[in-house]
UniProtKB/Swiss-Prot annotation:
Binding site for Zn(2+): C283, C286
Pfam families associated with the record: ArsA_ATPase
CDD domains: ArsA
Keywords of the record: ATP-binding, Cytoplasm, Endoplasmic reticulum, Hydrolase, Metal-binding, Nucleotide-binding, Transport, Zinc
Name recorded for this polypeptide: ATPase get3
Organism encoding this protein: Talaromyces stipitatus (strain ATCC 10500 / CBS 375.48 / QM 6759 / NRRL 1006)
Classification lineage: Eukaryota, Fungi, Dikarya, Ascomycota, Pezizomycotina
Active site as annotated: D63
Enzyme class per UniProt: hydrolase
GO terms for MF: ATP binding; ATP hydrolysis activity; guanyl-nucleotide exchange factor activity; identical protein binding; metal ion binding; protein folding chaperone; unfolded protein binding
Family the UniProt entry places it in: Belongs to the arsA ATPase family.
Nucleotide-binding is among the record's keywords: yes
Length: 340
């Protein structure tokens, strides 16, 4: 009994993300935390490490601040693009607000819309925007579309600061509800709308209502499939990123509680910006800060004894560009050893 407990303890204490690299069934990896704790650096570094052990990796930023371009020093957009210097690591940045306009526009400007006279275009827009979280949910749909057409083996999400992250994970449910509602409306008013649309020249892009509904139905099926995958610990995990301070620890705890509520697996925490001053270091601020960090680190280890807690040092310069990111990423798999 005691030996089993000891083995479990050893496993729990491995202070690296190696277990994520070893778990070959993983398809979706979310990296999240509050603003300014090094989420993007961590997600880029994790993606770099994954690219060494997986056939193809896609790194997606859903943070409106889009820091991937800054991190790699290369412009990314809403189409997946290979990261310079890699053959199997691609990245893309999604604008949550752009996607729904694209979807509603699909096929022409508002002024060309044959439904504008009926106020139908506006009605569709109002209907769409009245669903909570729908703008970001559409960006999620955009991701799914890309991911389905480009078969990546593993997808890493660099998510927006905490609040948005958890909403992002609810999107499959939000979209499923919205699409179910639209299907119901289409069933009730479809024939009437089709005859009105027919006399007005149809929907933008020459679609009719049935085409639109079947598109939405196939989207709903994809979403429901992904929703199931998100709740499967073999396929999805969430890496929490924080710093050793009260507010960040509080946010992390809140996030872990919510993830557990959504049945989303999380078993790794990356603690960034740690100070390791030498014993005879005369810098009072460094020593005082280290003392505070030590207190919160102990709390993290106590609270999350069954988590892989990775301790990352505060570096003297920014982690930007391929070489620095690669160097930083090594510390995710080989524990950092501070100088004596």
């Amino acid at each position: 009994m005691s030996s089993t407990a000891l083995i479990h303890d050893d496993e729990a204490l491995e202070p690296t993300l190696q277990s994520i690299l070893d778990q070959k069934t993983l398809r979706w990896i979310f990296v999240g935390g509050k603003g300014g704790v090094g989420k993007t650096t961590t997600s880029c570094s994790l993606a770099i490490q994954l690219s060494k052990v997986r056939k193809s990796v896609l790194l997606i930023s859903t943070d409106p601040a889009h820091n991937l371009s800054d991190a790699f020093g290369q412009k990314f957009g809403k189409e997946a693009r290979l990261v310079d210097g890699f053959t199997n690591l691609s990245a893309m940045e999604i604008d949550p607000n752009g996607s729904i306009q694209d979807l509603l526009a699909s096929g022409g400007e508002a002024q060309d819309d044959p439904l504008a006279g009926l106020g139908m275009g506006g009605m569709m827009q109002d209907l769409a925007f009245s669903i909570p979280g729908v703008d970001e949910a559409m960006s999620f749909a955009e991701v799914l579309k890309q991911v389905k057409s480009l078969s990546y083996e593993v997808i890493v999400f660099d998510t927006a600061p905490t609040g948005h992250t958890l909403r992002f994970l609810q999107f499959p449910t939000v979209l499923e509800k919205a699409l179910a509602k639209l299907s119901q409306l289409s069933g009730q008013f479809g024939p009437m709308l089709n005859s009105i649309l027919g006399s007005r020249g149809g929907l933008p892009g020459g679609q009719n209502l049935d085409d639109l509904m079947s598109k939405m139905e196939s989207l709903r099926e994809t979403i429901s499939e992904v929703n199931t995958q998100f709740k499967n610990a073999d396929m999805t995990t969430f890496v929490c990123v924080c710093i050793a301070e009260f507010l960040s620890l509080y946010e992390t705890e809140r996030m872990i509680q919510e993830l557990t509520g959504y049945s989303i697996d999380t078993h790794a925490i990356v603690v960034n910006q740690l100070l390791f001053p030498k014993k005879d270091n005369p810098c009072e601020q460094c020593n005082a800060r280290r003392k505070m960090q030590k207190k919160y680190l102990e709390q993290i280890e106590e609270l999350y004894e069954d988590f892989n807690v990775v301790r990352m040092p505060l570096l003297v310069e920014e982690v930007r560009g391929k070489e620095k990111l690669e160097k930083f990423s090594e510390m995710l798999v080989k524990p950092y050893v501070p100088p004596e």
